[in-house]
Amino acid sequence: MPASSLARWKRWLPGAVLLTFIAHAAAPKAPPVSSEPPAIRVPVWVEEEQPSSPAALRFEATINGRPARIAATQGPTSDLIVLVVLDLTDDISLIEPAKQALIDNISRLPANAWVGVLRAQDGLHVLADPNPDRKPAVNAIESLSTSGKPGLFETLDSALRIADSMMRASPVRVAVLYLTDGNIYNYREDYTNPVINSSDPHDLSRRFPEALVIEKVSRMQETLASLEGPLFIAHLHYRTDRLNEAYQNGLKTLADETAGEAEFSRSPADIPDSINRMFARMLSGSSLTVNLPSEARENLQVKITGRAGDAEARLYWRSRYVWKRKAKSL
């Protein structure tokens, strides 16, 4: 990673300082005054069998139908920070192949891709700060003990705020990858929506046992709409009961909200391929810094196009944001 990029965000380390920032960022505060035009970061992928190089594309953007200036482009070969969040509590026969696939992918990353490792149990904890040296990340993964309750729901907001802080501090791409085996029944909070009136056959809680999960996901989706880093989720254990299917659909909804992805492995053999695809996707993305028009509203609809000569590329990008004025850095 270029020294200039590192210098801008290295002050977030060590992890204790980083988590202190998250607590600070969650507190209400007045919008900062900035001389720079407000902007959002839009993740973009070229979705073609033989894609044009993003460097060869001429990107254009509109926000709520109005032209918007693209101030900067970070392509697939630009600096990348991957924040791996481990949320592993269950079957060791699934966890071990997942840890090995994770280590293999980290070892293959290019030199300008840095990896940090966090744990989601009992709050978000930094196990290895983002670093070009792979050893701290690998050691953290290998030594991880698997116990406790699932923590994805409780830590997701904080993890994505870390990603936002890094993107505001330096012109790098940042992605958040959750590796999880969570079962909705094992959360500390009860999402089972128990029957309120057992003597009433028409009690709605009988008909909609997944209502609490859906409500939780809806609230989280609105929070994620104001955060800009893409979210990737590799779930090690697809479950078929009604409540876990609602939970798994909710995880996919949250990843889709950020233009990331969620995959659910149905067998141990699926796990390495799923993690491989997640890393390939994170590496292949671009990030556009798009200035907001002066009349931009809170709810933003974004459209990105890319052309190579007269041909228009097939793109996938994040299209919905809720914009809230943010400080560039602390």
Language-model-detected regions and their locations in the chain:
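Bacterial N-terminal signal peptides that target proteins for export
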Residues: P2-P14
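VWA/integrin I-like adhesion module and closely mimicked acidic/polar interface patches used
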Residues: G182-T253
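Von Willebrand factor A/integrin I-like adhesion domains
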Residues: P230-L283
